[in-house]
Amino acid sequence: MVGNEGRLIVLDAGSGMRALGANVEAAEQVDVLITHLHMDHIQGLPFFAPLHDPDVRVDVWGPISTTQTLSERLNRYLSPPLFPLRVRDLSNVVFHDVPPGTFEIDGIQVTADLVSHPGPTLGYRLEENGKVLTYLPDHEPALGMHNFPKNPEWTSGYGLASGADLLIHDSQYTDEEYSERVGWGHSSYSHLLAFAAMTGCRTLMTFHHDPDHSDQKLDEAHERLRATGPEFEIVAGTHGAVLDV
């Protein structure tokens, strides 16, 4: 996400960080918003080129913990023998422990809140000039196929996603797959549609696809999702996709 004056905001730090870092145009400031510290969301961080450039300030934001700071927790991965450098060796990096609440990045209002997923996990809502992007990549809005909440105020993530222009949301499981994985912290297709409809979002980008799903299976799934006739646009999250919010 590009903010004011080209300031870059990156949502999570998965394997795409290496390619992103190699193609980032000159920027003096990068902000990385981490939802949680599961490996698929942080494994690309040490390979992000701006992290090692003393002329670029990188602010890393992530969920607060009662036991260790964000930098201490990331240092368990960013240190030998898993990686040759330690967090303290990074040249111009600032870590922020994020509690539920609202803060500002270069005029963009960022709201963070805990969502339903194993371990401390944040969702993010970014607002600027009346436009809203909500990012909920790992999110189980209801437990069980028949327990979707009727009251929005009691639904995990609703406050972050309400009225979003772009909702980027977990879409890992088919309903059949989810029935055997209740409580794993990911969404079924039915819950995905119900949650998006509840929020009144304008565009839904499906995200966090199951790595065992082939491109053909994903294409077929998205045909079925669109065939339900939702009041919002459905866009499949793909590598290199560019959207205007």
Task: Give each language-model segment a name.
Residues 1-137, 142-145, 157-158, 218-245:
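Binuclear metal-dependent hydrolase catalytic cores
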